[in-house]
Amino acid sequence: MDYFTLFGLPARYQIDTQALSLRFQDLQRQYHPDKFANGTQAQQLAAVQQSATINQAWQTLRHPLTRAEYLLSLHGFDLASEQHTVRDTAFLMEQLTLREELDDIDQSKDDVRLESFIKRVQKMFDARLQQMVEQLDNAAWDAAADTVRKLRFLDKLRSSAEQLEEKLLDF
C-alpha cells in the first residue's frame, strides 16, 4: 500500500495537509505499539512495524520535497537513490556563484546582506516549487524530476544560509 492510500488521500502532489494530520493522529492511536502490549509477540511486532510505516509515511508526505520525490517514485523515478545530477550548466554556475556569495557573507559577517540573500534564495525556491507543482499536476514526470533535483540544491543553499544566520545571531 502506498503512503497516499494509507492516509486515504489521492496520489497527487497537492494534498489536504489538515486531513493528512488528522489521519496521522487517528492511525497513531489505532496502531500505537502500547495498545498491543498484552498481545502475542507477532501482534506486537506487527504493531511496531505498522507504527514505523505510519511515521515514515507522515514524514514523507508532510514535507514538500519528500512528497514530490515519493510521488515521482510511484511513477518510476527513484530520486532518493539515483546517481543523476542536474545537467543544466547555467543553473549549476548560478549555484556556484550563490555559494561564493554566501561564503563572502560569512567572511564579512554582514547580517543585512545575509537577510537579503535568504529572501532571494527563498524566492528562487518558491518559483521552482511552483514550477514543480505545475509539472506534477500535468504529469510531466521527467521535467518534475529535474525540477526536484534543482530544488534540492536550493534547499541545501537555503539551509546553509539559515545556519549562517543562526551563527551570526549567536556571535
From Swiss-Prot:
Domain of life: Bacteria
Domain J stretches: 2-74
GO biological process, one term: [2Fe-2S] cluster assembly
CDD domains given in the database record: DnaJ
GO molecular function: ATPase activator activity; protein-folding chaperone binding
Family annotation (InterPro entries): DnaJ_domain, HscB, HscB_C_sf, HscB_oligo_C, J_dom_sf
Alphabetical list of SUPFAM superfamilies matching this protein: Chaperone J-domain, HSC20 (HSCB), C-terminal oligomerisation domain
Keywords: Chaperone
Cellular component, GO annotation: iron-sulfur cluster transfer complex
Function of the protein: Co-chaperone involved in the maturation of iron-sulfur cluster-containing proteins. Seems to help targeting proteins to be folded toward HscA.
Self-association state and partner proteins as the record states: Interacts with HscA and stimulates its ATPase activity. Interacts with IscU.
Similarity comment: family membership: Belongs to the HscB family.
HAMAP family, per database record: HscB
Name of this chain's protein: Co-chaperone protein HscB
Species name: Salmonella agona (strain SL483)
